[in-house]
Amino acid sequence: MIIYATVVQTINSFVRLESLKEVYGLIWIFVPIFSLVLGIITGVLVIVWLEREISAGIQQRIGPEYAGPLGILQALADGTKLLFKENLRPSRGNTPLFSIGPSIAVISILLSYSVIPFSNHLVLADLNIGIFLWIAISSIAPIGLLMSGYGSNNKYSFLGGLRAAAQSISYEIPLTLCVLSISLLSNSLSTVDIVEAQSKYGFWGWNLWRQPIGFIIFLISSLAECERLPFDLPEAEEELIAGYQTEYSGIKFGLFYVASYLNLLISSLFVTVLYLGGWNISIPYISILELFQRDQIFGTTICIFITLAKTYLFLFISIATRWTLPRLRMDQLLNLGWKFLLPISLGNLLLTTSFQLFSL
């Protein structure tokens, strides 16, 4: 009996050990996801504060200054206010479409962050088709906007949803062609491989210098995909009140607000990854690999800092553009996409393909 009791205790201890391992495994699965979401939320809060401060500087006025030091908690105050507001629904609208639309817009953009590499070893999903995954997922967001506009049973909302879909289709194609040119130069569709391909020649190895035309087209198309001025036709206040957001209030309206800045941040990160060398420091005689060999935590921190510094440089350009240029008309927007950017991006892809074939 004593031997039997000992065996039972041993088996129970092993079972507890295995269950603890499973629990720890589950915890370590969610830790990177939670860290990424926390970083994204912090990045969005910083972008909102930067936009308020930069717009105040451009317009020569004082920005937010009461919510926290230098107004840094203004975005948190706005989010809290929207959280406690009543969620109104149109009486004759399509309630399922009206409710699901904002969630689809936010979730599709959040999933795109999984393929962003912040360093050589810090990427949530290092996939062989990472770039195509981003393009495929980002094309789902306009469907959510169209659902929101249609479900609102409002002519202004429906027109805003149609404009969002038309604008996305018009600028998604030039953007995809620019990405294909980059993948041809890097011989890969993985975001990590694209960054490493730019690290061979330092600063002059960036795709910015090898694809200047593609960089400009990607820049314009990214702003159009984010629906930022001068491309904010889906929510033009003078024409459509607030576009597809007209009937929304409370937290659902806040989701559109968050989705806009999430889209801007992901576009800035992809500009950094595809054209600005990603996490590479690009300073002579300083190698990221040497930093990793000395101290992996220090090297990863430096890589994250470099990536974010390049990202916020593009964000500054986007914010300054919003408060500088006037809004385009709808016909000008579509003509720019179909008659100007699409032929140039297609020619750039054919030229890149020719150079790659002759260099074999």
Curated annotation (Swiss-Prot):
Keyword tags: Chloroplast, Membrane, NAD, NADP, Plastid, Plastoquinone, Quinone, Thylakoid, Translocase, Transmembrane, Transmembrane helix
Reaction equations catalysed: a plastoquinone + NADH + (n+1) H(+)(in) = a plastoquinol + NAD(+) + n H(+)(out); a plastoquinone + NADPH + (n+1) H(+)(in) = a plastoquinol + NADP(+) + n H(+)(out)
Top enzyme class: translocase
Compartment(s) where it occurs, according to its Swiss-Prot or TrEMBL record: Plastid, Chloroplast thylakoid membrane
Pfam families: NADHdh
Positions of transmembrane segments: 27-47, 98-118, 129-149, 165-185, 203-223, 248-268, 269-289, 297-317, 340-360
Signal peptide (from-to): none
Membrane topology annotation: Multi-pass membrane protein
GO biological process: aerobic respiration; photosynthesis, light reaction
Gene Ontology MF terms in the entry: NADH dehydrogenase activity; oxidoreductase activity, acting on NAD(P)H, quinone or similar compound as acceptor; quinone binding
EC number: 7.1.1.-
GO terms under cellular component: chloroplast thylakoid membrane
PANTHER family: NADH DEHYDROGENASE SUBUNIT 1, NADH-UBIQUINONE OXIDOREDUCTASE CHAIN 1
Function: NDH shuttles electrons from NAD(P)H:plastoquinone, via FMN and iron-sulfur (Fe-S) centers, to quinones in the photosynthetic chain and possibly in a chloroplast respiratory chain. The immediate electron acceptor for the enzyme in this species is believed to be plastoquinone. Couples the redox reaction to proton translocation, and thus conserves the redox energy in a proton gradient.
Family, as annotated: Belongs to the complex I subunit 1 family.
Listed name of the protein: NAD(P)H-quinone oxidoreductase subunit 1, chloroplastic
Lineage: Eukaryota, Viridiplantae, Streptophyta, Embryophyta, Tracheophyta
